From Swiss-Prot:
Summary of activators and inhibitors of this protein: Inhibited by NaF.
PROSITE patterns recorded: PPASE
Binding sites annotated in the UniProt record for diphosphate: 140
Protein name: Soluble inorganic pyrophosphatase 6, chloroplastic
Active site positions: 142 (proton donor)
Enzymatic class: hydrolase
Domain of life from the UniProt record: Eukaryota
Cofactor: Mg(2+)
pH dependence: Optimum pH is 7.5. Activity is extremely low below pH 6.5. Activity decreases slightly at more basic pHs, activity at pH 9.0 was only 10% less than that found at pH 7.5.
InterPro entries: Pyrophosphatase, Pyrophosphatase_sf
Family per similarity comment: Belongs to the PPase family.
High-level lineage: Eukaryota, Viridiplantae, Streptophyta, Embryophyta, Tracheophyta
CDD domains: pyrophosphatase
Length: 300
């Protein structure tokens, strides 16, 4: 029998049953800040792109989202589906809204901190449930626990046809943008958190660009203390280095080379992270509008 739990998810900007451009423009005031941890500096003036508004498609409005687990945990059949208030399956990737305004975003937990089962949204399955990743028919695990909550930003996509000129011309990894949430609480698979981005790391995995947005949940006791990359080093000393080193080295025990990082091997600041989020939201919008080839990706 499927197990079901109810989450209180953040609501969308406006109610909708079809694709729309949100009324609130995703813009930032002109300001310049630099990360104290050797962080890259990014001016908000440069964040004005062709499209200033976050794109959202069929974003759910009902704050009650049910998470339904099907199949035994840590099995090939295990899936975590998301249901709306009527019990209809929805996609955590496509139907949960990205932005809530005022620099706050929805974050969906795939892997709870202090666990090592490699969970991910199944981007090629209907309704994109969360499942455990496999290789050659076997379940995948990290060689050691991940020390932070890990998951995705909904309604984002790293376009594999787009070469990033700022990161060695690397192409996107064809997945939603990853988030590393540094709060103290261990979350559950499928939890939806309100987070604020703090920094970004440009990981290069076998030649593909795989952004890691460092963020914190708004309900964490230290959330009010951190607003940018330099605050992370002050209030979470050593965390940015630990995140970089963990993702650099986790494949080594399997005999693979270490991952690399662009942008001078340094974390970029909050403004740069927001730029990445906006750009990948625009890429996702092109995907769901079928302006680019979706390949095997599920669009519902």
């Amino acid at each position: 029998m499927a197990a079901t739990r109810v989450l209180t998810a953040a609501t969308a900007v406006t109610q909708t049953t079809s694709c729309f451009l949100a009324k609130q423009a995703f813009t930032l005031p002109a300001k310049k800040s630099c990360g104290g941890f050797g962080g890259l500096c990014f001016s908000r003036r440069a964040l004005v792109l062709k499209s200033k508004r976050p794109f959202s498609c069929s974003a759910i409005y009902n704050p009650q989202v049910k998470v339904q687990e099907e199949g035994p945990a840590e099995s090939l059949d295990y899936r975590v589906f998301f249901l709306d208030g009527s019990g209809k399956k929805v996609s955590p990737w496509h139907d949960i809204p990205l932005t809530l305004g005022d620099g706050v975003f929805n974050f969906i937990v795939e892997i709870p901190k202090e666990s090592k089962a490699k969970m991910e949204v199944a981007t090629d399955e209907d309704f994109t449930p969360i499942k455990q990743d496999t290789k050659k028919g076997k379940l995948r695990y990290y060689p050691y626990n991940i020390n932070w909550n890990y998951g995705l930003l909904p309604q984002t996509w790293e376009d594999p046809s787009h070469a990033n000129s700022e990161v060695e011309g690397c192409f996107g990894d064809n997945d939603p943008v990853d988030v590393v949430e540094i709060g103290e609480t261990q979350r559950k698979i499928g939890d939806i958190l309100k987070i604020k981005p703090l920094a970004a790391l440009a990981m290069i995995d076998e030649g593909e660009l795989d952004w890691k947005i460092v963020a914190i949940s708004l309900d964490d006791p230290k959330a009010h203390l951190v607003n940018d990359v330099e605050d992370v080093e002050k209030h979470f000393p050593g965390t940015l280095t630990a995140i970089r080193d963990w993702f650099r080295d986790y494949k080594i025990p399997d005999g693979k080379p270490a991952n690399r990082f662009g942008l001078g091997d340094k974390p970029a600041n909050k403004d740069y992270a927001l730029k990445i989020i906006q750009e990948t939201n625009e890429s996702w919008a092109k995907l769901v509008k079928r302006s680019v080839d979706a390949g095997d990706l599920s669009l519902y």
